[in-house]
Swiss-Prot record:
Belongs to the MobA family. Transfers a GMP moiety from GTP to Mo-molybdopterin (Mo-MPT) cofactor (Moco or molybdenum cofactor) to form Mo-molybdopterin guanine dinucleotide (Mo-MGD) cofactor. It comes from the Bacteria. The N-terminal domain determines nucleotide recognition and specific binding, while the C-terminal domain determines the specific binding to the target protein. Keywords: Cytoplasm, GTP-binding, Magnesium, Metal-binding, Molybdenum cofactor biosynthesis, Nucleotide-binding, Transferase. It is found in: Cytoplasm. This is Molybdenum cofactor guanylyltransferase. Mg(2+) binds at residue 100. It comes from Vibrio parahaemolyticus serotype O3:K6 (strain RIMD 2210633). InterPro entries: MobA-like_NTP_Trfase (IPR025877), Molybde_CF_guanTrfase (IPR013482), Nucleotide-diphossugar_trans (IPR029044). GTP binds at residues 12-14, 25, 53, 70, 100. The gene is mobA.
Amino acid sequence: MLQPTQTSWVILAGGQASRMGGKDKGLIELNQKPLIEHVIERLSPQTPRILINANRNQDAYSKFGFVFSDQFKDFPGPMGGIHAGLMHAETDWVGFVPCDSPQINTDLVERFCQAVKEDSDILVAHDGDHQQPVFTLYHKRVLPKLTAFLERGDRKIILLYKECNTSYVDFSDSPNCFVNLNTPEELAQFGQLES
């Protein structure tokens, strides 16, 4: 079985946050802490290697760990961060989570590791109803396919999944793990629930 110590995990904070009024979501505060800090608190007991993908405010993010930007400058969404993460991580297996999901499961990394098979390329979380494509674990061997995919201008992740050996990790017992805060209203509502 793949061990959590054999993985690296990247927090994806490279988006444009258009629904958050352009404010950098990872740095927006929830209960007096930046969202990214909530994610790190959940993730750091699970893995020794956490990296951050951010395309702006890199100095602010560097307080939390090693920061790198996308290689593709046209903001291809989370796929750009996944691509850059595969390039920067030192392990063969690289996991990804978004910066705006403060309730990540405390066993997320372990569940992904347990689901890895010898021929796995990509593992994607599934909440019982939907796949959660930014909660994922990639093997570095996917990098050439992902590079070609992005160079072609493709952005639909489902097409990449069809090119690779993709499987799904069951999180149907904990759908709240995937709550992400995309708007000021969602942030305010979630903050009231947490208080």
